[in-house]
From Swiss-Prot:
The lineage of its organism: Eukaryota, Viridiplantae, Streptophyta, Embryophyta, Tracheophyta. It comes from the Eukaryota. Coiled coil: none annotated. InterPro entries: RPM1_Interactor (IPR053234). This is RPM1 interacting protein 13. Signal peptide: none annotated. GO terms for cellular component: nucleus. GO terms for biological process: cell death; defense response to bacterium; leaf senescence; negative regulation of plant-type hypersensitive response; plant-type hypersensitive response; positive regulation of defense response to bacterium. The keyword Nucleus applies. The keyword Transit peptide does not apply. Interacts with RPM1 (via its NB-ARC domain). Binds to ARF1 in the nucleus.
């Protein structure tokens, strides 16, 4: 083998690392040193030349290309792509989301109830304020019935009770929702009325037939009708009888039965009389508090008692001025009496029989004579009271008097005033 033979060694490497030229030179020198003895003893004429160093291709599944420009810049690497890099990039992004284990189940904000059951007024697909309330989506529910829309009351052509208009802003729908849930309608709390104080003015006008009671006294004023020409006034300064009130004159057409008001346990009855117009031996007595009316089958009279004198140290003056009512329906007998009752334990009745004055003409409403009857000194007080009590009883038991008392004539067309005739002197002597 001549010295002209030359051997070329080719180093094949398949790594990604850069080839170190120093290592290659040293390795080539070592290999040439080993091969020199062989060249000296061999006659072979084979020549080995190292033409170029070829590196292995890079697998795409282990290396991600940054860009197409980077692949073109690498002269040593030749990469063949099996698919479109853009699609690969989208697939990779989807795979990355799956690797994070994040599952989107809903959305937040104004349309949070779009994918979940919701009442009609919260629907995101059909806005409650801008669309018809009759429309609904797959997730809409009735706010009142709490069932999937439409409910039986969804749209029944009555706008006030259609459940499609229900919302959580009005009180009526809240009450109906509570009624469907519990079975009873909630009631509103009742408000208590505020107490108010009514103040009556002090200066008030007294109405007709109204009785005014003054403190520490008993005063009664009765206003008679306009046809009566006189006033009936009674004053009694008794402090404990403020509750007593004199009754006004009853209607003459409605009086039928005899009423005698007395209470023997609390007071003693005193007959107030007026003696006038005596004819012959008889004495005519007119009673102020007795109104006698006679019809075709009955007659009635009313006698009002005096007030109760509890304290004997007080003085009572009773003055009565009464006149006869003109008319054809009734006869009203008037009386004027002056009684002075004084004493501390005993009462004195003074009757003056000597002052009896017979009237020359019949009494009328305009012409009335008065007389004062004083008890004679020989007559006892108890006897007089007994006689008066018997007279009361007789009047009450005999509504249609006969005998000494002349019955009243039937009412006629003419105006008249008749009297009750009674023998008072004979009655006292009995």
């Amino acid at each position: 083998m001549g010295s002209g033979n030359h051997v070329d060694i080719v180093d094949v490497s398949s790594g990604e690392e850069d080839v170190d030229t120093r290592g290659d030179v040293e390795y080539t020198d070592w290999l040439n040193g080993v091969m020199e003895p062989v060249d000296d003893t061999s006659d072979s004429t084979d020549i080995v030349e190292v033409l170029s160093e070829v590196r292995g291709g890079v697998n795409s599944q282990y290396r991600k290309p940054n860009s197409s420009n980077q692949a073109l810049e690498d002269d040593d690497d030749c990469v063949i792509l099996d698919c479109d890099p853009d699609k690969t990039r989208e697939t990779t992004s989807v795979d990355d989301d799956d690797d994070d284990d994040v599952l989107v189940v809903g959305q937040k904000g104004e349309i949070a109830c779009r994918d979940f059951p919701h009442p009609r007024h919260s629907c995101a697909k059909y806005a409650f304020n801008s669309t018809s309330h009759e429309k609904y989506c797959d997730m809409c529910h009735c706010y009142v019935c709490d069932i999937r829309a439409p409910c039986p009351y969804w749209c029944i052509a009555v706008s006030s009770i259609d459940h499609c208009h229900a919302n959580d802003k009005e009180k009526i729908w809240k009450n109906q929702r509570e009624y469907f849930r519990t079975g009873y309608m909630p009631t509103a709390p009742s408000s208590k009325p505020t107490p108010s104080i009514l103040r009556v003015p002090k200066n008030t006008l007294l109405r007709k037939n109204h009785v005014e009671i003054r403190p520490c006294s008993s005063s009664t004023r009765v206003a008679n009708p306009s046809s009566v020409k006189a006033r009936h006034r009674i004053r009694q300064p008794i402090p404990h009888n403020q509750g007593l009130q004199s009754q006004p004159a009853q209607s003459l057409s409605t009086v039928r039965d005899s009423v005698i008001q007395k209470d023997r346990s609390s007071y003693r009855f005193s007959l107030r009389s007026r003696v006038a117009s005596s004819a012959g031996n008889g004495i005519s007595i007119r009673f102020n508090n007795a109104q006698v009316s006679q019809s075709s089958h009955h007659s009635s009279s009313t006698v009002a008692p005096t007030l109760n004198p509890e304290t004997y140290t007080q003085q009572r003056n009773v003055r009565d001025h009464c006149t006869a009512l003109p008319g054809s329906q009734s006869n009203v007998f008037t009386r004027h009496a002056d009684q002075n009752i004084r004493g501390s334990g005993n009462r004195q009745f003074q009757t003056n029989v000597d002052r009896f004055a017979p009237s020359k003409a019949p009494l009328t409403a305009e012409d009335s004579h008065t007389a004062t009857v004083q008890q004679q000194p020989g007559i006892n007080e108890n006897v007089l009271e007994t006689k008066l009590s018997e007279f009361e009883k007789w009047l009450m038991e005999n509504p249609n008097p006969t005998g000494p008392v002349s019955p009243l004539p039937e009412p006629g067309n003419q105006d008249y005033a008749s009297t009750l005739s009674f023998d008072f002197e004979t009655f006292l002597n009995d």
